[in-house]
Structures are given as C-alpha cells and as structure tokens.
C-alpha cells in the first residue's frame, strides 16, 4: 500500500506542475475569474479535460495484488484496475467552473477511462460523471451565495467523491471488495491531498494577481489624490514640478519628466543636469509621441534618442497627455536599467496618464467657467466640485483592498460622471439620456459610499430620452434630495424620478420621503440663496434661474413639501425644442 501511495504522489506532482504552468497563462486566470458565455465554459472544459486525461494515462495498473509500474498506460487488461488522480481534475473543474464545466469534464474523463478498459472501467466512468455533477452544483451554490471554496473543503469533498467511486466498484464489479481493499485508502489519501495542493496553488496565484492589481490601483489613486490640486492649475512649470516630485516619490522610477508640446516643464531624478525645465525637447522619442499621440517605450539609449552623450537613462515609457482628444504634452518615466521597465510599470504609466488627462480637462473646465461671466445662463451652470472627487477617490481606494472588481466599475462610473460634467459645462442643452447617465454615475458613487442607504426609482418614458434638457438639472435635484432630504437615522430613504409627456410638454418630478421643509423656508427656496445650517439652496436657485432664462417663467420650479412627509419638486419644458444652436440663437436674440 505504501508503494502505491508513493507512486500516486509522483503522479500528483505531474498534475500540480501542469496546473502551475496553466495558472501563469493570462487567459486561464481570466476564465477562472469569470466565464462570459458558453465559449469560455467550453475552453475550461477542454483545459481541465487535459488534467483528467493525463491522470488516466499516468494511472497505476494493478493486476490482483501486483502493481504494474508503467509510466504511460496505453490500455488496461480486462482483469486489471487503475489507481489514478482523475478525481482531482474533475473535482476542481466543477468547484471553479460550475455545473456545465463539471459535467463536461466528468463526462470526458469518464468516457476516456471507460475506453482504457479494465474491470472497473464502467464504475469509474459513472463515478467520474457523478463527481462532475456533484462538484459542479456545489461550486454553483458557493458562487451564488458569494462563499469562498477553501482547499480544506476541496480535500474533504475529494474524500467523499473517491468513497463514492469505491461504492460504485462494490456495486458493479464482481470481485469489488478485493479491489477496494487495495486502492481505496491510497486513492482517498492522494486525491484529497492533491486537490488541497492544486487548489491552494491556483488560489495563491490568483490572489497574488489580485493583490498586485489592488496595490497598483491604490498607488495610482494616491498619486491622483496628491496631484489633483496642481493639475487644476494646468500644465505650468510650477505645477508640473510638484507633480513630477510626487510621481517620483511614489513610483520609485529613476526619473520623471513632464512636457508640453514644445519644452520640458519639469524633470526630477537622474539626468537633471541636461533635462532642464524651460529648455526645448531633447529626446526624439518625446517628439514622436507628440506627433503620433501614441504610447511608446524604449529599452535603449538609441531608441530614447537623447541628444546628450552622457545621459544615464537607458529605458523609458512616454505617454501622451490629452485634452479633448488633442495631445497637449507628455508624461515620461525613465529607468537606468532596461529590466526595470516591466508590464507593471507600463500599466501604471498608462493609468496615470488617463487620470492626469482628466484632471487637466477638469482644470481647464474650471478656468473656462470663470471666463464666461458675460453669459449669464452659462455662468449659472454647475461647477465641478473637487470635494466630490476626493470622496470618490477615497471610496474606490478603500474598495481596492476588499473588492477589486467593484473598484474598477466605480472608476468607470467616476469617469462617466466627470465626462458628463465636462460636456455639460460647454452646452446649454443635452439629450435627456445623457443627463440620466450622469444621474446614474452619481448614484453609483454615492451608493458605494453609503451601501443600502438610498433607494432611487426612475420612471422615464423611452421616447423622451432624445429630448433636449438643460444639463445638471436632474442630477442636482437628485443630489439635493440625497444630501438634504433625509435625517441621519431614517431607515428607508426613497427618491422617485418621473419624466413623462403631457399636452406637448415634458414633465419632470423628483419626490422623496424625507423630513420635509418648513413653510417659511419653502417660500424662499428657488427664488434666492438663503443662509441656513441645512444648506443655502444655491442648487435649486441656479436650476430655477436657468430654466427661466432658457424657456420662460412658466417652466420655473414648483416645490411642495410637508414636514415629516417628504418633498416633491416639479417643472416642465417644451418637448420639441429643436437643435441646441437654434435655442442659443433664440435666447441671444
């Protein structure tokens, strides 16, 4: 028995090595995280079927009490049986891939085992299929209830499944008792041990990747948080100097440089003696990035093409900084050792460049809003609030350590939110669908900060989504409700948004079940800015002024509220307002 255990452990080592190699393939790791449709499930079935087929071929043939020491089985005599590690592959596939993958792998493993022959061919084939069904549905239940499958659980489950196989042998094979006495204990021990090792290794590699992504995201967000005040000032030598110092401190690169389209704005680290701020660009790589607008990397001085002969910088990645689709500068990370420029550094640089480009657009939008004082309506449009960005960054940063996928989705919602801010700040009217996207992005971020606190229901007629509306009106009304309508301890905070057509006008209603507004304050809201601990009413005043300025007094806000009952804000606008250019002309005339 001991010899059989030792020989089977050798086979486990082969399967573990195969699993280790596969775990370092990006596609395999992605499939374990998420299967998008039947094609991905088919890929997993093929991969894990290889495990089981290898296990069948490397099984140990046993004829009576004699162990046949063959490295690769071509077939099994009708009087022999096989002790193998097939259940490892079937069990892990079901736990990680679910019912379809488990049943698929179990069926292939069972059919292949049956084709090899032997006294236990039929019983092993049936038990393989049953193993796929059982582990597949257990994996599905664990995933449904968001529970983690531990290696210990996998080992215990393997004991049960191999025991089930032994029962099948007893039921089907004529001399099953002697076979079970020979192979039961070795197969139970080795398969449970192998399942524990294989799942532990796969999960460790996946966890290592998740931790690396979380740390990388956390690093990017910290840099973004630190650099935001400077990028709001635009691409100036002073602001870029502080930004370069922050990036250099947090990334550990040998040098960091920022440029505009003509000159170096800041350079921190090695080669500062000839990469001098305010001097013209001296690397051909930077000029090429500015010309093409594409990310470029170099792993030699020749490719960097620095005009200074003694430049110690041997590798670089140069990323374009963009604003509204135009390249306005570059971010450059330099290294003195080409081996330091790995895929991790490339992804870090790409992430920073995207965030910096957004920050530059935010700064430009803020500057332009200050220059539009001659346009009264545009001056009333909502300004970008940096405090909201700080709160959102802190929320995503916290999620990076607990839920990387949710943090990624929130980053996308944050991008949508600020894109809507930027677009809205330059337009008098936008499609209702764009405004609803703005509202949804804001809600996603707020609900991430305060889980299960707010319930927002939206009732929108589909044919009205192309109607032109003033930007920010719904978003600010929903934000106003979430911030001011509810006392801290209110258990159910509900907001309803209704948009419908009636008599050629588009009607908007925003209702909440909050604490309501006192009658004295209610008379002032929307008509003036008021002083209060609960807020100044600036958002409602701005919305009201914009509606009146665009469509006339008949479209002004109507606010109804009862203390401890809730508030309802309504307004109407014409449905067929035409193109934005026509509206602008009619207003200016």
Swiss-Prot record:
This is Sensor protein LytS. It catalyses: ATP + protein L-histidine = ADP + protein N-phospho-L-histidine. Signal peptide: none annotated. Member of the two-component regulatory system LytS/LytT that probably regulates genes involved in cell wall metabolism. The modification Phosphohistidine is found at residue 387. Its EC number is 2.7.13.3. Its main location: membrane. It comes from Bacillus anthracis. Disulfide bonds: none annotated. It is a multi-pass membrane protein. One of its GO terms (biological process) is cell wall organization. It is found in: Cell membrane. Gene3D superfamilies: 3.30.450.40, Histidine kinase-like ATPase, C-terminal domain. The keyword Transferase applies.
